[in-house]
Amino acid sequence: MTVARLTDAERDALLAELPEWALREDGLAIVRTFRFADFSQAWGFMNRVALHAEKTDHHPEWFNVYNRVEVTLTTHDADGLSARDADMARAMESFL
């Protein structure tokens, strides 16, 4: 299945909307580090994201150590950012 890649203008609008997110150096993904009070809160966040990811069939790349969750969003079928990444980033923000 081919997924449309975001245009530069769409990508820039997304980053303006979500200022905590940054464009990865290669321009093909967005990244964010979430920090929580403790491991339980970080894990709870990851559980909420995981349920959403399964429902939408779009999964983040992430790394967790104690209260920190590092997230990378990209769409392999688009070879870069797509609306699916934008939707996932917005969902993650709503789970805070």
Swiss-Prot record:
CDD domains: PCD_DCoH_subfamily_b. It comes from the Bacteria. Its EC number is 4.2.1.96. One of its GO terms (molecular function) is 4-alpha-hydroxytetrahydrobiopterin dehydratase activity. It holds the Pfam family Pterin_4a. It catalyses: (4aS,6R)-4a-hydroxy-L-erythro-5,6,7,8-tetrahydrobiopterin = (6R)-L-erythro-6,7-dihydrobiopterin + H2O. Keywords: Lyase. InterPro entries: PCD_sf, Pterin_deHydtase. The keyword Chloroplast does not apply. The keyword Lyase applies. SUPFAM superfamilies: PCD-like. One of its GO terms (biological process) is tetrahydrobiopterin biosynthetic process. Belongs to the pterin-4-alpha-carbinolamine dehydratase family. NCBIfam families: PRK00823.1-2, PRK00823.1-3. This is Putative pterin-4-alpha-carbinolamine dehydratase.
